[in-house]
Amino acid sequence: DVQLTVPSILMALLVDGIARGIISREMHDEMAIYVLIFAIGISEWPQFARVSRAATLVEKNKDYVAASTIIGVSNLVVMFKHILPNIMRPILVIGTIGLALAILAEATLSFLGVGVPPTTPSLGTLIRLGNDFLFSGEWWITFFPAIFLVLLAFSINLLGDWMRDTLNPKLN
């Protein structure tokens, strides 16, 4: 619960700062994408943990799990054949929302100059580099990457909404 109170960008900046302090600049430039993935993953994992724990606790107390346990099915079989398939629906929905948030976090960090190096293509880097030309009449250098970023995040969120509506048996 404590990690949920820390903004994901701040957590990613902290992890990236620690990585920059531990490893050399050349090594950091080579491993920047992995550090970025780790930083965003560390900042986003509490949502997945909370949803999967809540869904597991709900499924664990259902009658079919008790019946499987009574007839002698092992805990691993109950977990992988009964509980895991039933908790995948909310995890997939949260995963699509998490993917959109991860893309926005990467673009934000790259825009701030903390993400991937300038030689690696990134929407945030393109937007940051286009800001230098924004007032010189070449607005499209910033506009099109920004619009693409917004449309990408919006389409992934629409996919998550569609999955939620399709996979939720209570809405059918």
Which residues make up each language-model segment?
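Alpha-helical transmembrane segments of integral membrane proteins
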Residues: 1-172
